[in-house]
Amino acid sequence: ERFSATEKIMKTTLNTEVPDNLPQSKHAIVILGYALADDGTMREPLIERLKVGLAAANKNPNSKIIVTGGVPKQGNTEAKLMKEWLMSNGIAEGRILTEDKSTDTVENALFTTAILEKEGLKDVTLVTSASHMRRALTIFTEASDFYDKMIAKNSDRAFTNVVYLDYPSIEEAHNVTKDEAMVIYRDLMRATGVWQY
């Protein structure tokens, strides 16, 4: 069942533009972090993800924004700098929730799902690089299912996506390589294993 869900996710259309019909209530835009440079500054992929997240936030003014990423460098976490960048680009501080403990995609998903549950947020638009999106969707779906089992409810959470295109073309972005598939299944197995014990 898990694998068939993942195979479906691998066929997901990656959106390079913010979709028009996103939910208008109980909706979160989740922007995934990217490792900071050694000097504690944001690298290009993270800034590009933020630009996509900003476009989604401006188009959906009722949505909360969750910035996710720990791993401190020079006293900064990804989430801290992401929040500062969004605020400097006109997003109100009250809209932004930070998840600054995670060190990888599995933890991003687990810790962010806890925030979604706590804040009563249902549906999610994930924002990350095209090369990372299928893995992120797989793990976030698994995290949501795990929480549902743990608290004995069905959140019926819907995931949408907007990507920063880090491929020469969208056609290439939609081609799942063997390496990418292996990493997705590895993280899925790890996520499932981590959460069972």
Report residues per predicted region.
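Short beta-strand elements at the ligand-binding edges of bilobed clamshell
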Residues: 39-46, 98, 175, 179
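Glycine-rich phosphate-binding loop at the start of an alpha helix
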Residues: 47, 102, 106, 110, ...
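Short beta->alpha junction loops
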Residues: 70-71, 96-106
